[in-house]
Design a protein with these regions (language model features):
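Start-transfer (signal-anchor) and selected internal transmembrane alpha helices
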Residues: 1-36, 124, 172
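Extracytosolic helix-loop segments that constitute the early lumenal/periplasmic catalytic or substrate-binding loops
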Residues: 33-38, 50-80, 88
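Transmembrane-helix signature of polytopic, membrane-embedded enzymes
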Residues: 105, 122-143, 177-180
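Aromatic- and kink-enriched transmembrane "portal" helix at the membrane-lumen/periplasm boundary
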Residues: 83, 87-90, 104-108, 112-118, ...
Length: 181
């Protein structure tokens, strides 16, 4: 019991990390975009790559597989074939997409969820204290490009989340090795 109490005193618990990540992303979004989230429409045209990616994810959610939408060339493909994202990435977006439903901006909502999970897991695994969490948020806010690409229909949020998970897990393993050795 003492170990748990000491751990909670030194580092925020997972729920606080998740809450902090959500508050940070909401603050970032409203400071940068000043548009209510329910009024966001990302693509400029229906042939935009982000709209095509969204259609692929929606077709996986509604039909169980892609319905022939590719990206980049704004062309169509055979039904059941995956485009440039490939099946792994489409299904990686379709699974959290089940939480949000088959809507117009399902990829945006998945991106926001993925980056929030990445930041929260990194902060928890790296055992950042409150001041370090604030510094992390300040650093992410100052470079801004990774966060801007997460508020989109592109797949960069998945890449950033995976990078944060890998670095956070490596920090946790390093700390555990120091304690054990």
């Amino acid at each position: 019991m003492q170990k748990i109490r000491t751990c909670l005193q030194k580092t925020p618990n997972a729920l606080l990390c998740a809450l902090g990540a959500v508050v940070f992303l909401a603050g970032f979004y409203f400071l940068c975009y000043r548009t209510p989230l329910n009024e966001v429409w990302l693509p400029t045209t229906m042939n935009n790559d982000e709209a095509l990616y969204n259609r692929q994810v929606v077709s996986v959610l509604t039909h169980g597989g892609p319905q022939g939408y590719f990206g980049y060339q704004e062309s169509t493909a055979d039904i059941g074939r995956y485009g440039t994202w490939g099946p792994l990435l489409i299904w990686a977006y379709a699974l959290p997409g089940l939480l949000f439903g088959a809507g117009v901006n399902v990829v945006l909502w998945c991106n926001l969820l993925l980056i929030a999970v990445g930041v929260a897991v990194f902060a928890h695994c790296a055992r950042l204290n409150y001041w370090q969490c604030i510094a992390l948020c300040g650093a992410l806010f100052s470079i801004m490009l990774p966060l801007r690409s997460c508020v989109s229909g592109a797949s960069e949020a998945m890449h950033y989340m995976l990078a944060l998970l890998i670095v956070g897990t490596a920090a946790a393993c390093t700390a555990a090795a120091r304690l054990a050795g």
